[in-house]
From Swiss-Prot:
Belongs to the OXA1/ALB3/YidC family. Type 1 subfamily. Required for the insertion and/or proper folding and/or complex formation of integral membrane proteins into the membrane. Involved in integration of membrane proteins that insert both dependently and independently of the Sec translocase complex, as well as at least some lipoproteins. Aids folding of multispanning membrane proteins. Coiled coil: none annotated. It comes from Endomicrobium trichonymphae. It is found in: Cell inner membrane. It is a multi-pass membrane protein. InterPro entries: Membr_insert_YidC, Membr_insert_YidC_N, YidC/ALB3/OXA1/COX18, YidC/Oxa/ALB_C, YidC_ALB_C, YidC_periplasmic_sf. It comes from the Bacteria. Keywords: Cell inner membrane, Cell membrane, Chaperone, Membrane, Protein transport, Transmembrane, Transmembrane helix, Transport. One of its GO terms (biological process) is protein transport. The chain crosses the membrane at residues 6-26, 298-318, 324-344, 390-410, 434-454, 471-491. This is Membrane protein insertase YidC.
Amino acid sequence: MQKNSILFVTLSAFTVFIWYFFFAQPSEQSYRQMMQLQNTVAVSESGVNKFKNADLNEFQIDDIYAKEEHINIETEQYKAVLTNKGGGVLSWSVKEKNGQWVDLVFPESAPVMANFPNLTYKVVSKSAEKIVFEYASKEGWKITKIYNLSDLYMHNLNISVEKNAKTPFPQIDLKWGPGLGTDSKELKENISLTRALVYTAVKPNKLKKLKDNFEPASLCKWTAVDNRYFLVAFIPKNSMDFDKILFSRLEKKHPCSVILKAAEPKDVDKKDYSVNFYLGPKDYKYLKTYDLGLEKTVDFGFFGFLGKIAFSILVFFYKLTHNYGWAIIMLTTIIQILVLPLTLKSFKSSAAMKRVQPVIKDIQTKYKDNPQRLKAEMLNIYQSQKVNPLGGCLPMLLQLPIFWAFFTMLRNAYELRNEGWILWVKDLSAADQFMQFGSFNLNLLPLMMGIGMFFQQRMTTVTSDPTQRKIMYIMPVIFTFMFWSFPSGLVLYWLTNSLISMIEQYFIMKKDAITVKHI
């Protein structure tokens, strides 16, 4: 069994290791430099960053030095700062469960949702529920922007454009980015996790990650920018009002921007554009209540169907315990019970291989100069003893999808954010940070996990093979290093998994020892 256990652990480690380092994280300084660079320009149809509003330049220049006015809105769940410059948003912070605020707008990317940022709008009215901006040009066209605000995360923006017969319609765009704000402790990883998305309107509806412009916009129900835990989505009430979704990312490692570009009206002098917009957390159950497919932005990974099942069971256990830490432990226990038949099958296959090893070694010595005869004799032994040399590996490999689905679900579940377990574990979505020595954080759970893995391998790796013994000592160290800064919810899962595996192996080995005496 020990070889197969080592194989399973090694494959799991390799998978996690590749995944973790695939998302290499830049420094905070380089991230902010990227934000400043990309925000010097905006997105165009070709992906090159510029706005096509040459006909408005003279009015923009006149308004550059006009007085800026800020409108502050605060509710129990969010607080926002809007500006009369472009009628845009300077800041939009949502309140977390621990009472802290997370601003979804980076200062380097503000203002967002602005139309012609250099135009100074008149503030017609303002309240906690409704803000009205208006801009009237000397040429006879007028833009009115009305923010209809709710108490939670879904709001509405209505843009009304009027013109006279001689003037063209100004181009209306709705922009977000570059990037999406997050907690300061997650700033480094945010760049690799920020995505631009569209959700197609044609059934079967699909969530697509943008890598280029998307057109026609009428083929999508909404477009969004998200990161691990937060989402900004634009949902047009009439998708036919919009022409294209423009995407921009200067380089692969840079934050992205999206613009919802309005279609040019035909044969009318007035046009209204209405867009609902969501700014808030990626709470799976909450997003699902909108019935818009927004919950699909929650990443359950390649084995998403398994991740969703695990998530539903996790929430069920949380309702029983009111503690996500205990819910993780209970769910891990259930998973271990479910895969126990595979574990037993793997052990039985390994035990059978162990019993025929002396005979195989004799045959290998006897026919070392005759490969064909050696192969035939070994096949004969496997068939006569009903032994499958791969029988111990396959059950372990079948567990990998379950492991990966659970791992991805815990990694991306907003529900674990700011949820503690016991004592020093205050946030299951962050490293546990038992003690701090200067800039070094002592994380206790990864150490406990590494110690548990060491004793688990020591129980099963009864071998004189020096290579296997080295692996027994090295693997716990590698895993401790890899999981050091991982969310404590993930580490708790792996620690629980190791402890349960040790208990299972103890009883399996004990039973096997009794069985051997009667052979």
